[in-house]
Curated annotation (Swiss-Prot):
One of its GO terms (biological process) is homotypic cell-cell adhesion. Disulfide bonds join 28-89, 54-63, 88-99, 103-118, 120-129, 146-154, 148-161, 163-172, 185-197, 191-204, 206-215, 228-240, 234-247, 249-258, 271-283, 277-290, 292-301, 314-326, 320-333, 335-344, 403-415, 409-422, 424-433, 446-458, 452-465, 467-476, 493-501, 495-508, 510-519, 575-587, 581-594, 596-605, 663-675, 669-682, 684-693, 710-718, 712-725, 727-736, 753-761, 755-768, 770-779, 792-804, 798-811, 813-822. Its main location: membrane. The gene is MEGF11. It comes from Homo sapiens (Human). This is Multiple epidermal growth factor-like domains protein 11.
C-alpha cells in the first residue's frame, strides 16, 4: 500500500514536470538523481565438464575435462538514475502550461515581455508604460517621430496624421484639391464662375468680374474687374463688360467709352448699318430713322408728301382751295382754271355766275353749296350734302365731303351727316357705340343708374329689372308672397302643416313635429321637436306631443313625466301643498321631494350638475372633451369646443376652408394659402404675401414670405414660388446669363436659325446679319445684278454688259473690253484674257509684230531645251551603266490614260538602270512582289495635279518607303528612265513613285540638293520633265535593313 502511494505521488510529480513545454525559451531544465530498486544480471561461475578426444583407449579415446564457465544470474540492487526536470527560468512564473515573465512594477498600458521589461502599447512609454506620448512622437515607447505638417495632430498610437482643415495627404503636406475644402477636404466648394476656394474655410476668391458670397453674381452695373473695384467709363448708356471693363455701346454710339455718335451715314449697333435715307434725308444715329427734307416722308424719305400736306415731315396742311395743287416743298398753290389768288380762293367770275364771259347762272342750291366752278358750273357741296345741285342729303351710312366717308357707328346708332359723329341707341356708349353700358347703368349714354336690388340685373336699354329667384317688383325689393317661389314667383309651394317654403328653390323647412320633403309626415312615436330629433321621456303616458314633447298622461297621472298623481305643483295630503321644485323638476305626491329634470340637482333642483357630469340625476360622466374650455353641457352632455375644433369630443380640427367657433367662419386665404383653424390667419404658399395671401411677391423676390432675392439676368422673370428664371428670348442657363448656342434663337433657344452663306443670327430675334455680297431675309440671295457690297447697297459701275462681283464689285469684262469699269476697248491680242485691266503701250501693229517675234523665240527655246534634255538623258544612261544602281520602288502611281491597277510595297532588284516600260513591264510585274490585289492605280485623278500634292496611298507601306517628291534631285547617280506605257501618254506628271537608290558597294546614301520646284497646274509642255527624277529615300540606309 505504501509502495503504491509512493508510485502515485511520483507519477503525479512526473506529470506535473512534463506539463511545461521544453521548447519554450522561458523554460529552464536541470538534472536530478534518484535511487531505483532494480533486478540486475551478473556472471555466475560454475564448473563445466566437457569431453575431448585423447589416446585413452580405455575410455574409447574420450577424456573428461573441466573448465570455469559463467552463466547469467539475477539479483536485487539499488541504481542511481538521473532525469531532466523542467521549471520556469529565473524571472518567470508558471501559469498553467506556460512560463510567464514577471515584472515587479505593473505595466499600465502594455504587457510584460521579459522580467521587469514592459512592452508598451502604441502611444505610451515609460518603464511601466504609464506615460503618454507627446505631440511629436508616437508608437510603442513613443519611439517614432511624427511626420505631420501644417499644424496636423499626430495619432499617438498609429502615427496617422489628423489634418487640419484645408490639408490632405498622409503627412498633411498638400492643400485640398481644387473644388474641395474643410476638414478632410470633404466639403465641396460652392464657388462659381471659375472662382478659387480657400481650402481652409471655403471662402470664395472671385475671379475678376464676379462678386457675391459664392461669386454667383456679376459685378454691379458700373463696376468691373477684380473685386468689382474698377469704375466703368462707359457713357451714353453703354454697358461695361464685368470682367474687362470694355464698353458695349448702345446703338448709335461708338468709341472706347461710347462718347462719339455714329459717323454721318451710319447708325445702329456698332454703327454697322448704312443709312437708307433718300432725297437728302438725314439718319438718326441711334435708330436709323430718317429725318426727311421738306416735301418728303416715309421710312426712307422716298415718298412725296401726300395730297394736302407739305413741309418738314409733311406736317403742314395745304391751304389751297378750289382744287388747287399744293407744292410739297413750299406749300405754294397752283390754281385750277377759273381761280386765282395765293390760295386759289378767288373766283374769276362773280358769285353765282360761270362759263365763258361769266354769263351763265350757277345751278347750285345756295344754302348747301360751298362754291360754283367758274368755268364748268359744277357745284361743290357743303359736308353732308350731295347731288348735282347739292340738294340731296347724304345717304344712310355715309357722311362728310361729297358723302364719301362711311359711317363707323354700331348697334343701330345714328350717324351725323356732316361730322360722322354717332348718336348711340339706349344701352350703348363710346365713340362708335360699340361698348355696352356698364353694370348698374342704362339708357342713352348710359347716364341712368339702375335701381335693381337683391342681385337683380338691369336692362342696359330701359333699366327694367330681371329679379333673381325669390324676388319680385319693379326694383326686386318684394319677396315672393307666401306659398310661391322661383323666378318671378311663378311657382307654388307644396309644403304642408305650416312649413315654410324657400322663395328661391321651393324647399320646405318643416315646423317641429313634422318630417318629409313636403313636411307631410308626423314625428314617429317616441320622438318630437325640430326634425323629430328629441326623444319623449314619459312614465305613465300615451306618448308625447310631437311638437313640444309634452307627455300625454294616462288617466289618474300628472306631472312632467306623468309620474305624479297630484296635479302639477301639488303634493301632500289631498295635494294641498304646493311644490317648490325649480328648473322644471317635479315633486313626489307623497313627500314633495323633487325629481330634477336632466342637468339639475339639489333638494329643489336649483343647481346644475357639477362639472364633469350631466343628464338625469347628474349621473352620466361627461365624455373626454379634448379641445374644450370647460366640461360638457350639463343637460345634453355635448362638448363646447374651442375655436378651431369640432366633433362630439372636440377632437377634430376644422375642415379645410373653415375656422373659429364651431368651425362656422369661412377662411379667406387665397392662392393655396393654408388657414389657421383657430383664428383664420393665413400661412401663405411660397410666392405670396399679405393678410389673405392675395399679394404676389414684388418683382425680384421669391419664396416663403418673399424672403429670397431673384438672381435672374437679362430681363428674365423670376418664379415667385421657386425662384426659377424664365428667360427672355435669346437667353438660356440657370440664371439666363448665357446666350443661345450658335444656330439657335428665341424663346428657350428653341428656334433654329435660317441664316445662310455664313450670315450671323441674332440670338434674340433670329434676324440674319448678311455677309458682304448677300441679301434676303435669310441671306440666301446674292446681290441682284448691278449691286454689290454690304447690304447690296452699292451700285456696280461696270459698263458694256460686263458682270460685277457681288462681294467686291470687281468688273469682269465682256470680250473686247478692258479697264477697271470695262469702259476701254481691248486690242486683238488682249482678247485672250478678258480680265486684263492694263492698257497696252503699243498699237495694234506693234502687238502683232511682237506676238510673231515672241512665238518664234519660244519655238527656238523649246528646240534648244529638247536638245539639252536629250543630251542630258544620254549622259545619265552612260553613267548609269558604270554605277549600276539597285533601284527599289515603292510606287503610289497615278498614270493618266491607263487602266492598270497597282498598289502596295513593290520592290525590285535590277542590275540594269533602264528598261522599256511597254515591252518589259510584264516581266517586271512577274518578278515583282506586287499583285493587283494590293496596289491601285487610279486613272481618274486630275492629270494636272502637282507632285507637291501626292495622292493618298491605298497600299500599306513600310515606314521607310515613302519619299515626298517636291523637286528634281541633283546627285551623282543618273536619273532612272521611266518611259510611258504608251505613245499616247505624254504627260506623266501624275506618276508619283517613291524611288530609293542604293549604290552597290556603298554603305551610305547619296547626298542631294533639293530645289524648290512646283509643277505648273493646268498647263504642260511635252517633254519638259516628263521623266521623274530618281530620289533616294532619306529614311533608307543600313539601319533600315535591320528594321526590315
Amino acid at each position: 500500500m505504501v509502495l503504491s502511494l509512493t508510485g502515485l505521488i511520483a507519477f503525479s510529480f512526473l506529470q506535473a514536470t512534463l506539463a511545461l513545454n521544453p521548447e519554450d525559451p522561458n523554460v529552464c531544465s536541470h538534472w536530478e538523481s534518484y535511487a531505483v530498486t532494480v533486478q540486475e544480471s551478473y556472471a555466475h561461475p560454475f564448473d563445466q565438464i566437457y569431453y575431448t578426444r585423447c589416446t585413452d583407449i580405455l575410455n574409447w579415446f574420450k577424456c573428461t575435462r573441466h573448465r570455469i564457465s559463467y552463466k547469467t544470474a539475477y539479483r536485487r540492487g539499488l541504481r542511481t538514475m538521473y532525469r531532466r526536470r523542467s521549471q520556469c527560468c529565473p524571472g518567470y512564473y508558471e501559469s498553467g502550461d506556460f512560463c510567464i515573465p514577471l515584472c515587479t512594477e505593473e505595466c499600465v498600458h502594455g504587457r510584460c515581455v521579459s522580467p521587469d521589461t514592459c512592452h508598451c502599447e502604441p502611444g505610451w512609454g515609460g518603464p511601466d508604460c504609464s506615460s503618454g506620448c507627446d505631440s511629436d512622437h508616437w508608437g510603442p515607447h513613443c519611439s517614432n517621430r511624427c511626420q505631420c505638417q501644417n499644424g496636423a495632430l499626430c495619432n499617438p498610437i498609429t502615427g496617422a496624421c489628423v489634418c487640419a482643415a484645408g490639408f490632405r495627404g498622409w503627412r498633411c503636406e498638400e492643400l485640398c484639391a481644387p473644388g474641395t475644402h474643410g476638414k478632410g477636404c470633404q466639403l465641396p466648394c460652392q464657388c462659381r464662375h471659375g472662382a478659387s476656394c480657400d481650402p481652409r474655410a471655403g471662402e470664395c476668391l472671385c475671379a475678376p468680374g464676379y462678386t457675391g458670397v459664392y461669386c454667383e453674381e456679376l459685378c454691379p452695373p458700373g463696376s468691373h474687374g477684380a473685386h468689382c473695384e474698377l469704375r466703368c467709363p462707359c457713357q451714353n448708356g453703354g454697358t461695361c463688360h464685368h470682367i474687362t471693363g470694355e464698353c458695349a455701346c448702345p446703338p448709335g454710339w461708338t468709341g472706347a467709352v461710347c462718347a462719339q455718335p455714329c459717323p454721318p451715314g451710319t447708325f445702329g449697333q456698332n454703327c454697322s448699318q448704312d443709312c437708307p435715307c433718300h432725297h437728302g434725308g438725314q439718319c438718326d444715329h441711334v435708330t436709323g430713322q430718317c429725318h426727311c427734307t421738306a416735301g418728303y416722308m416715309g421710312d426712307r424719305c422716298q415718298e412725296e408728301c401726300p395730297f394736302g400736306s407739305f413741309g418738314f415731315q409733311c406736317s403742314q396742311h395745304c391751304d389751297c382751295h378750289n382744287g388747287g395743287q399744293c407744292s410739297p416743298t413750299t406749300g405754294a398753290c397752283e390754281c385750277e382754271p377759273g381761280y386765282k389768288g395765293p390760295r386759289c380762293q378767288e373766283r374769276l367770275c362773280p358769285e353765282g355766275l360761270h362759263g365763258p364771259g361769266c354769263t351763265l347762272p350757277c345751278p347750285c342750291d345756295a344754302d348747301n353749296t360751298i362754291s360754283c366752278h367758274p368755268v364748268t358750273g359744277a357745284c361743290t357741296c357743303q359736308p353732308g350734302w350731295s347731288g348735282h345741285h347739292c340738294n340731296e342729303s347724304c345717304p344712310v351710312g355715309y357722311y362728310g365731303d361729297g358723302c364719301q366717308l362711311p359711317c363707323t357707328c354700331q348697334n343701330g346708332a345714328d350717324c351725323h351727316s356732316i361730322t360722322g359723329g354717332c348718336t348711340c341707341a339706349p344701352g350703348f356708349m363710346g365713340e362708335v357705340c360699340a361698348v355696352s353700358c356698364a353694370a348698374g347703368t342704362y339708357g342713352p349714354n348710359c347716364s341712368s343708374i339702375c335701381s335693381c336690388n337683391n342681385g337683380g340685373t338691369c336692362s342696359p336699354v330701359d333699366g327694367s329689372c330681371t329679379c333673381k329667384e325669390g324676388w319680385q317688383g319693379l326694383d326686386c325689393t318684394l319677396p315672393c308672397p307666401s306659398g310661391t317661389w322661383g323666378l318671378n314667383c311663378n311657382e307654388s309651394c307644396t309644403c304642408a302643416n305650416g312649413a315654410a317654403c324657400s322663395p328661391i328653390d321651393g324647399s320646405c323647412s318643416c315646423t317641429p313635429g313634422w318630417l318629409g320633403d313636403t313636411c307631410e309626415l308626423p314625428c314617429p312615436d317616441g320622438t318630437f321637436g325640430l326634425n323629430c330629433s328629441e326623444h319623449c321621456d314619459c312614465s305613465h303616458a300615451d306618448g308625447c306631443d310631437p311638437v313640444t314633447g309634452h307627455c300625454c298622461c294616462l288617466a289618474g297621472w300628472t306631472g312632467i313625466r306623468c309620474d305624479s298623481t297630484c296635479p302639477p305643483g301639488r303634493w301632500g295630503p289631498n295635494c294641498s301643498v304646493s311644490c317648490s321644485c325649480e328648473n322644471g323638476g317635479s315633486c313626489s305626491p307623497e313627500d314633495g321631494s323633487c325629481e330634477c329634470a336632466p342637468g339639475f340637482r339639489g333638494p329643489l333642483c336649483q343647481r346644475i350638475c357639477p362639472p364633469g357630469f350631466y343628464g338625469h340625476g347628474c349621473a352620466q360622466p361627461c365624455p373626454l372633451c379634448v379641445h374644450s374650455s370647460r366640461p360638457c353641457h350639463h343637460i345634453s352632455g355635448i362638448c363646447e369646443c374651442l375655436p378651431g375644433f369640432s366633433g362630439a369630443l372636440c377632437n377634430q380640427v376644422c375642415a379645410g376652408g373653415y375656422f373659429g367657433q364651431d368651425c362656422a367662419q369661412l377662411c379667406s386665404c387665397a392662392n393655396n394659402g393654408t388657414c389657421s383653424p383657430i383664428d383664420g390667419s393665413c400661412q401663405c404658399f411660397p410666392g405670396w404675401i399679405g393678410k389673405d395671401c392675395s399679394q404676389a411677391c414684388p418683382p425680384g423676390f421669391w419664396g416663403p414670405a418673399c424672403f429670397h432675392a431673384c438672381s435672374c439676368h437679362n430681363g428674365a422673370s423670376c418664379s415667385a414660388e421657386d425662384g426659377a428664371c424664365h428667360c427672355t428670348p435669346g437667353w438660356t442657363g440657370l440664371f439666363c446669363t448665357q446666350r443661345c448656342p450658335a444656330a439657335f434663337f428665341g424663346k428657350d433657344c428653341g428656334r433654329v436659325c435660317q441664316c445662310q452663306n455664313g450670315a450671323s443670327c441674332d440670338h434674340i430675334s433670329g434676324k440674319c446679319t448678311c455677309r458682304t455680297g448677300f441679301t434676303g431675309q435669310h441671306c440666301e440671295q446674292r446681290c441682284a445684278p448691278g449691286t454689290f457690297g454690304y447690304g447690296c447697297q452699292q451700285l456696280c459701275e461696270c459698263m458694256n454688259n460686263s458682270t460685277c462681283d457681288h462681294v467686291t464689285g470687281t468688273c469682269y469684262c465682256s470680250p473686247g473690253f478692258k479697264g477697271i469699269r470695262c469702259d476701254q476697248a481691248a486690242l486683238m491680242m488682249e482678247e485672250l484674257n478678258p480680265y486684263t485691266k492694263i492698257s497696252p503701250a503699243l498699237g495694234a501693229e506693234r502687238h502683232s509684230v511682237g506676238a510673231v517675234t515672241g512665238i518664234m523665240l519660244l519655238l527656238f527655246l523649246i528646240v534648244v531645251l529638247l536638245g539639252l534634255f536629250a543630251w542630258h538623258r544620254r549622259r545619265q544612261k552612260e553613267k548609269g551603266r558604270d554605277l549600276a544602281p539597285r533601284v527599289s520602288y515603292t510606287p503610289a502611281m497615278r498614270m493618266t490614260s491607263t487602266d492598270y491597277s497597282l498598289s502596295g510595297a513593290c520592290g525590285m532588284d535590277r542590275r540594269q538602270n533602264t528598261y522599256i516600260m511597254d515591252k518589259g513591264f510584264k516581266d517586271y510585274m512577274k518578278e515583282s512582289v506586287c499583285s493587283s490585289s494590293t496596289c491601285s492605280l487610279n486613272s481618274s485623278e486630275n492629270p494636272y495635279a502637282t507632285i507637291k500634292d501626292p495622292p493618298i496611298l491605298t497600299c500599306k507601306l513600310p515606314e521607310s518607303s515613302y519619299v515626298e517628291m517636291k523637286s528634281p534631285v541633283h546627285m551623282g547617280s543618273p536619273y532612272t528612265d521611266v518611259p510611258s506605257l504608251s505613245t499616247s501618254n505624254k504627260n506623266i506628271y501624275e506618276v508619283e513613285p517613291t524611288v530609293s537608290v542604293v549604290q552597290e558597294g556603298c554603305g551610305h546614301n547619296s547626298s542631294y540638293i533639293q530645289n524648290a520646284y512646283d509643277l505648273p497646274r493646268n498647263s504642260h509642255i511635252p517633254g519638259h520633265y516628263d521623266l521623274l527624277p530618281v530620289r533616294q529615300s532619306p529614311a533608307n540606309g543600313p539601319s533600315q535593313d535591320k528594321q526590315s
